[in-house]
Curated annotation (Swiss-Prot):
Organism annotation: Exiguobacterium sibiricum (strain DSM 17290 / CCUG 55495 / CIP 109462 / JCM 13490 / 255-15)
GO cellular component annotations of the record: cytoplasm
Keywords of the record: ATP-binding, Chaperone, Cytoplasm, Nucleotide-binding, Stress response
Region named A: 1-340
Gene behind this protein: htpG
Summary of subunit composition and partner proteins: Homodimer.
Name of this protein: Chaperone protein HtpG
Function: Molecular chaperone. Has ATPase activity.
Family: Belongs to the heat shock protein 90 family.
Highest taxon of source: Bacteria
GO molecular function, one term: unfolded protein binding
């Protein structure tokens, strides 16, 4: 027996690798299974170039054997095994990758590839085991070897007897600690769960013993029978031919992966073989998850490296405006042990993400074009996120999303795209008009919209907080600027202008003095037809934006620049004129009342509701 030290490594390095790369101890099993799969792939590679070797895939498998009494977990494979030199080279040096070295010598010949990085992944076993024993017999040799280590202090190698080619790894599971239950890695149900989670699509069968109850022949009684059962699915759906798959196959996969309790509206199956190779199945859900619009929600797709799950939610694969998309990505070009930090700078991952965004956009555009009813169902659930995509990152993605958003049309009484709105605009209409408020019913009654509607121009109703912010970031659509119906200048040429007498001009000035600090101006309205009063705004901040900004935490004192407009054809206006001429105190009361009525119509708070109520009652007596 030879006792050796690890080459150029220390306890600190081993601990640093374990804690920095692996945050969940359960992934040790994923690493060992991946290495076992690699070992069988190596025989496959040899069979491709050596006609004397026959590769019968059915003869290759991985076996998992937990033993609670001895606290041992054994993983057996029928792979290529390791020589003594390979044991020292691959297991004696942390971060040395036998698989990567083999891969460099054997470039992919027909699609098979090597997953693991043996020197890194193997050492994850020490997260759950205090002793690791490896017994291996290399392909084409009669000699077997035993490698054993208790950790960073070193390892021993000796010759042993082993009948079959392959490798047996025995983990001596640690005793439980106060904050760590290692017993779970000896529980068959827990091991199956880990296998299904991380290694379900390894191409070789992963077998475990399972006890079944079977009827005893010639009797009503049953007996317990132990049988070997394959735990993993082996062939992932994303590697199957799309033509062989049905909608039901995709729905079943959606349910199996627990992407949601609903049925997806659409699936997207991608098989890319260009600058970067990857397969992906994406789903557009019908309904958001319960936490989708909460701060706890995490976006991301499952990320696999050649069939092995390396990240449950890779956020870098999805832009925020498509964060509702569920699904997975599997790439042969990604490393199994790539860290989150490295992923953020990975060129291949960025190419995949860019391609995925393009595919999602194309499919949503097709859904909008070909199945409007289904798209609107989707939009009711996720339209807010699409509009957020216009606003987010200073509008960097606005061109990606602008043709996917819908708004309620006042004229059509239905949702329309911006393109549909512009296409229906009369020739003399200069702007895309919109109105912001809590509901379409409330906006239908908005006093400021009377002139725009009289001209036969459509109005888009903005009923979500994000709408106006998104449109301001968009600036225009197809060269047409957006304009609120509350804007002081609607950009509408009128044959009849509101004529103001000298006395009325003086009265407006007096009203402005009464409302000093509250409004910028008081003037005659050109937009009001049946209502007595309304607010117009001047500048970028609308009244709805003011309400939203003031409701935010740590809000700044942001307010819309308000203009009080009066309908000079209304009876109320004549009452104000009379009061101005005959009763100045009443005139001031009327002025404040008009201002407060305008506040109420906009849903803004009145500074003193009690005084307002008393004032209304006083005027009734």
């Amino acid at each position: 027996m030879e006792t050796k030290q690890f080459k150029a490594e220390s306890k600190r390095l081993l601990e640093m690798m374990i804690h920095s790369i692996y945050t969940h101890k359960e992934i040790f099993l994923r690493e060992l299974i991946s290495n076992a799969s690699d070992a069988m792939d190596k025989i496959y590679y040899k069979a491709l170039t050596d006609e004397t070797i026959t590769f019968d895939k059915d003869a290759y498998k991985i076996t998992i054997e937990p033993n609670k009494e001895t606290r041992q977990l054994i993983l057996r494979d029928t792979g290529i095994g390791m020589t003594k030199d390979e044991l020292e080279e691959n297991l004696g040096t942390i971060a040395k990758s036998g698989s990567l070295a083999f891969k460099a010598e054997n470039e992919s010949k027909d699609g098979h590839d090597i997953i693991g990085q043996f020197g890194v992944g193997f050492y994850s076993a020490f997260m759950v085991a205090d002793t690791v024993t490896v017994v291996t017999k290399p392909f084409g040799s009669d000699v077997a070897y035993k490698w054993e280590s208790h950790g960073v202090d070193g390892y021993t190698i000796e010759e042993v007897e082993k009948e079959m080619v392959g490798t047996d790894i025995t983990l001596h599971i640690k005793a439980n600690e106060e904050d760590e239950n290692y017993d779970e890695y000896l529980e068959p149900y827990r091991l199956r769960s880990i296998i299904k989670k991380y290694s379900d699509f390894i191409r070789y069968p992963i077998e475990m013993e399972e006890t079944e109850q079977r009827p005893v022949e010639g009797s009503d009684e049953t007996e317990s029978v132990t049988v070997m059962k394959t735990v993993n699915s082996m062939v992932p759906i994303w590697r199957k031919n799309k033509r062989e798959l049905t909608d039901e196959d995709y729905r079943n996969f959606y349910q199996e992966k627990r992407y949601g309790f609903d049925a997806p509206i659409k699936h997207i199956h991608i098989s890319a073989d260009g600058a970067v190779r990857y397969q992906s199945i994406l789903f557009i859900p019908e309904q958001p998850s319960f936490d989708y619009y909460s701060k706890e929600f995490e976006k991301g797709l499952e990320l696999y490296a050649n069939g092995v799950l390396i990240m449950e939610k890779c956020s870098d694969l999805l832009p925020d405006h498509f964060s509702f998309v569920k699904g997975m990505v599997d790439s042969e070009d990604l490393s199994l042990n790539i860290s989150r930090e490295m992923l953020q700078h990975d060129r291949q991952l960025k190419l995949i993400a860019k391609n995925i965004q393009s595919k999602i956009k194309t499919q949503l555009e097709a859904l909008l074009r070909d199945d409007r009813e289904k798209y609107e169902t989707f939009y009711q659930a996720f339209g807010r996120q699409l509009k957020f995509g216009i606003y987010n990152d200073y509008g960097m993605q606005k061109d990606t999303v602008k043709d996917l958003v819908l708004f309620h049309s006042a004229k059509e009484k239905k949702l329309v795209t911006l393109a549909e709105y512009v296409a229906a605009m009369p020739e003399e209409q200069k702007y895309i008009y919109y109105a912001s408020g809590e509901s379409t019913d409330r906006l239908d009654k908005l006093p400021q919209s009377e002139l725009v509607k009289d001209k036969g121009f459509d109005i888009l109703y903005f009923t979500e907080e994000i709408d106006e912010f998104a449109i301001q970031m968009l600036l225009n659509y197809d060269g047409k600027e957006f304009k609120s119906v509350t804007s002081s200048d609607l950009g509408i040429e009128q044959t009849e202008q509101a004529e103001t007498t000298e006395t009325q001009a003086e009265m407006f000035k007096a009203m402005q003095e009464v409302l000093a600090g509250h409004v910028k101006e008081v003037k005659a309205s050109t937009r009001l037809k049946s209502h007595p009063v309304c607010f117009a705004t001047d500048g970028a901040v609308s009244i709805e934006m003011e309400k939203i900004l003031k409701a935010m935490p740590n809000n700044q004192d942001v307010a819309a620049v308000k203009i009080l407009e009066l309908n000079t054809s209304h009876d109320v206006f004549r009452a104000i004129e009379t009061a101005y001429a005959e009763d100045r105190p009443k005139f001031e009361r009327y002025t404040k009342l008009m201002y407060q009525q305008a506040l109420l119509m906009e849903g803004l708070p009145i500074e003193d509701p009690v005084a307002f109520a008393n004032e209304v009652c006083a005027l009734m007596i």
